[in-house]
Amino acid sequence: MRLVSKLLKALLVLLLAFGSVRYSCDNYTSGELQICKYTAPQHYRAIIGGRFPQVIKYSDSLVAKYETVVVPRVGSAVIHVKDTVEQKVVPSVIRTSRSSLSLVYTKVYPRVVKYAFIAESSLCRWYLQLCHQYTVYVKPVVINLYYKTMIKYPFLEHAIYSVQAQYKIMETHVFKYYNIISYNVQVWNDKYGYGRLSRNKIFIRMKSTVVEHLIIWYRYVNNRCRKMWRENLCPIINKSRERFAYHGGVRPESATTDPDDESIFYEDDDVDEYTETSTIVLTVTQTANSALDLKATPSASGLIVDECDMSMEEMLRNDFMSWKITIENKLSNTMKDFENDINEFAQEKLDHIQPTLADLLKRASNTSQTNFQIITKAIMDVNCTESVDPKTNKTIWFDQNNTQLPKYMTRELMREYFSAAHSQFDALSQEIRAHLRKLADEVNDHVEVLRQENVELFEEWADVMITEWSKNLAYVDVAVNEEKLADLEKEQRKNWKDFMKLKRQVIKTRDTLMEHPVKLDSLQSFVNTVQQSLKTLSHENGEYLYILRSKANLEFQAREALERQQREKEKAESASMKASTEFELSSSSFSSSSPSTASSCTASSTSTASLLAVEKTIALEDLQSYYQNVSSTDSL
């Protein structure tokens, strides 16, 4: 089985290679290459015809038989199948598709839309309920518990910010080493990997050859696909469209149209017929000399009679209700209008201040990160190496990477770095707080201005409406005849009571508007977010600077201990050198003394000789103490 698959793969590769070569020969080289000659079918036909003429005769007979027998039969079968498909299959497919579409549009789609709307409404309702439960019950409890815990156990907050600071340090180191590794990998790739390979001439030639062959093969496949599309698929698609348009056309409806006819794609049976009756009232002015005698139509006269026959009680009730509804609507919308004005102003201020504060917070964060990097680099420069410039004979210092430092890192310079970090962050914090205070002052001032404007507008409107309404009620009292006064007295008394009730309600609404609390939820949420972000940045900056200060202090202590040890060592070496010099001077003075004193200094010479013998075996740091002991012996 594996052998068969390998043979098939090899055959496929050979066919593809042969096809690409023939395409190149036919379209680009015009048969000038030798490979085009050897891959041409005429070449092999001539060779085989010269050696095996029977094979050529047999192949020609097969081709003639194919053209005379097989092609007509296959063509007739194809024509038969084509006619069958066009006459039976295509109309049935069209009818089925139309009925399916009609079923989907009339029954399936409305139900899907209905249930989807129900599901969406249920999901939205459930989501809103969940958000409400979380906002009202869960979030305040969690926030309260968090702040109580932080107040009761402050070390937890310190631990949290310490962990965050350590995480930022770790992130900085990881990013640093990642960049180093990436750079080294890139350098290695450029020296020994693909970069080196891409500079090889043989690889370049092979790559260009492969790319050229791939382009040729792509063009060949693309041309074949285009040719197949134009010659085979496009005619079939065009004929199918024509037949679908022919079978799917809507015929005009006639008196003998069958209701079950499938050519009617859609029929609307729910259209209700209706008639509209219009009444025209004609008004005619007749003069004394006119001979016209015009009469109103029955419908017009009936309409006029209905309006005239309306009772006074109904007219009063309708008029009173119109005034009452207008005033009640205004009272109910007064607070909403005021809140809408406030919200529009708050949104305008929020759109104006939000980019500024976001930029300031970003600057504060970037400034902190920059100062952290500067201080971290300064801490690394504490442990430096001292050297001497051979040209200027000045002391210079190098860091761990053997890079010369511009300045020697001292505690005073480190304090300046920390002071600059604190001052820069404090300046940005003060600027952010100043913007917040300015925003609060502007909002409060404008809220009072809007409140005063709305109150004045409401007072003016209420004064006009109440006055006009009271005048209207008074006119009704005067216009009513004495005969009907007894019947309408009760109604008018009730109207006056309702009028006074609404008047008191107007006054109460005005007082409420004067003291109505303003809820700026979006603006307050934004201010809280900015304050929380600033608090978080301040905590992170303080904690991380504290950690860096401790680390810098440890580095300075280690360096000072090393310098102290070095100074002590140098001091001990200088003392040893001084002692050895004094000893040599005393030895030379004893050897140059007079012979008369030789007998008295025998013990001293003996001790000096013993000292010279012992000096070779004792350590350098014990030389001074040994010399003092010998001097005391000599003096004695």
Curated annotation (Swiss-Prot):
Subcellular location(s) of the protein: Mitochondrion
GO CC term, one of those recorded: mitochondrion
Main location: mitochondrion
Highest rank taxon of the organism: Eukaryota
GO biological process, one term: sporulation resulting in formation of a cellular spore
Residue numbers spanned by region Disordered: 565-607
Annotated keywords: Coiled coil, Mitochondrion, Ribonucleoprotein, Signal, Sporulation
Biased composition (Low complexity): 579-607
UniProt keyword annotation of Oxidoreductase present: no
Coiled coil regions, renumbered to chain: 433-460, 551-584
Protein name: Outer spore wall assembly protein SHE10
Native organism: Kluyveromyces lactis (strain ATCC 8585 / CBS 2359 / DSM 70799 / NBRC 1267 / NRRL Y-1140 / WM37)
The organism's taxonomic lineage, starting at the top: Eukaryota, Fungi, Dikarya, Ascomycota, Saccharomycotina
Name of the gene encoding the protein in the UniProt record: SHE10
